[in-house]
Amino acid sequence: MADRGEDAESEDELYEVVNITDYARRHQWWSRVFGNSTGPIAEKYSVASQIMMGGVSGWCAGYLFQRVGKLVATAVGGGFLLLQIANHSGYVQVDWRKVEKDVNKAKKHLKKNAKKAAPELNTFIEDSTEFVKRNIVISGGFVGGFLLGLAS
């Protein structure tokens, strides 16, 4: 029995405790994907490659946005159409005064809180703007591809 206790202690000595947060800070996923340089993507790829990468990813995003957008617009429009048919047939009674009152209340609430934008949102917008400025070629390719994806 004494031998097992000594084995357990020696096994504990073989393992090293790793703090995952420190490891994650030192080994970021984008470093493995894009390389160790944290500068703009323009330093790593040619202009043609950047435009191609941005264009292809933008086209995919635009195409998906178009397809999903059509589906959502059809669902919302169909829901409004069914609501109007049910209202006209007498199945549903809509109190339009109450709807107008609630809409006006929501407008006032939005106007009051619009000036107090969340700091996370401001930080995200600033980071996005900085990314676009540093990677203008790939961003331009993405926008062009996105518009082509919407059109196709």
From Swiss-Prot:
Regions that span the bilayer: 45-64, 71-92
Cell compartments where the protein resides: Mitochondrion outer membrane
Keywords: Autophagy, Membrane, Mitochondrion, Mitochondrion outer membrane, Transmembrane, Transmembrane helix
Task performed by this protein: Acts as an activator of hypoxia-induced mitophagy, an important mechanism for mitochondrial quality control.
Name the UniProt record assigns to this protein: FUN14 domain-containing protein 1
Motif (YXXL): 15-18
Gene (name only): fundc1
Keyword field contains Transmembrane: yes
GO CC annotation: mitochondrial outer membrane; mitochondrion
Record carries keyword Transmembrane helix: yes
Membrane topology: Multi-pass membrane protein
Any single biological process term in GO: autophagy of mitochondrion
Principal subcellular localization: mitochondrion
Pfam families reported for this sequence: FUN14
InterPro entries: FUN14 (IPR007014)
Protein family per UniProt: Belongs to the FUN14 family.
